[in-house]
């Protein structure tokens, strides 16, 4: 058993305090520190470097591969590919990942008699993907729909954003929030959710020891990338994002090299790529899937046979949650995408308006049951 620090707020005062709880399957392991610190896993620098998506070994070849991946993930590239994709191939993908709207009746039949628990990514799921990440606003109609959803089912936002940033967009106190790819988890404000009436609001931060390092790398990345027009470094508290959506494609290789040159000096951080964004995160066994598992346990559904989790997301980082649900054999994932992608999700939706439509239909169905 490993002890973990979990922060809870006092039911009467609302003051945040720290307590220690025993480790369970969802808590393994905590943030990895240098081997001199007791209670942490010792991993050699050489082995850790292998976990980076790009590193010093064979730099030129890996960098070219990285830039190719950057191009492949761009919506423009996907659109050009779609024009050449055969209709048969697209239809085959749709058969494997049918529209959640078209399959709504089947979904409801599977969920009947079970407790639906909803998990939602933010960017590209509740809000459109935009050039400026600070302007990724959700519509008022989407906010009203999510608010109604939270009245019917326990609802969580699971995002790469920091909690403060995503809360400034969503503005709903009755939700659970898992920011920084699940490394910063906070329950609803007490009194706002009927699902946590008798429980303190839980705040779990498995990568807390990495905060000084993340801040240090953030400052270096800001300095390193300031000469690249359009590049934007975002501090998501427990992880960092380097957005290149507004960077000229001719500068992508240069930007990738700059980012790599910083991250390579921190072997306990890993570098990966999302939708026109580099992600820098601590190398710990924690992701959106682990966050989903932790939230289910916090809600009392850890060993429950009649729970039905639904996770909706559009990014590579959401795949960990999709895979977890497949492994549990409970609920399913829904990928938000207009184009065929390799995914562990069971169903698909094309864009945020379709997500809102699906959520609205779930709310209507629940209200009819009551």
Swiss-Prot record:
Pathway: Glycan biosynthesis; trehalose biosynthesis. One of its GO terms (biological process) is response to cadmium ion. It is an enzyme of class 3 (hydrolase). Keywords: Hydrolase, Stress response. It catalyses: alpha,alpha-trehalose 6-phosphate + H2O = alpha,alpha-trehalose + phosphate. Induction: By cadmium in roots (at protein level). Pfam families: Trehalose_PPase (PF02358). The gene is TPPJ. This is Probable trehalose-phosphate phosphatase J. Its cofactor is a divalent metal cation. Removes the phosphate from trehalose 6-phosphate to produce free trehalose. Trehalose accumulation in plant may improve abiotic stress tolerance. GO terms for cellular component: nucleolus; nucleus. Belongs to the trehalose phosphatase family. Its EC number is 3.1.3.12. One of its GO terms (molecular function) is trehalose-phosphatase activity. Gene3D superfamilies: HAD superfamily/HAD-like.
